[in-house]
């Protein structure tokens, strides 16, 4: 999980989710794309 100042979709499989006030990018197929904003 990468922590970045700004998160973007890197592929079509990415899903943007808000949990507990944080923005996450989750990808089950390619887990390298997982990111958290903050």
Swiss-Prot record:
GO MF annotation, one: structural constituent of ribosome
What InterPro entries does the annotation carry? Ribosomal_bL36 (IPR000473), Ribosomal_bL36_sp (IPR035977), Ribosomal_LSU_bL36 (IPR052010)
The record's listing under HAMAP family reads: Ribosomal_bL36 (MF_00251)
Q: Which GO terms describe its biological process?
A: translation
What is this protein's record name?
A: Large ribosomal subunit protein bL36
Query: What is stated as this protein's family in its record?
Result: Belongs to the bacterial ribosomal protein bL36 family.
Concerning Pfam families, the annotation shows: Ribosomal_L36
PROSITE patterns, from UniProt?
RIBOSOMAL_L36
């Amino acid at each position: 999980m990468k922590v970045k100042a700004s998160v973007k979709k890197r592929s079509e499989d990415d899903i943007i989710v808000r949990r507990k006030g944080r923005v996450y990018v989750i990808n089950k197929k390619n887990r390298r794309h997982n990111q958290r904003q903050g």
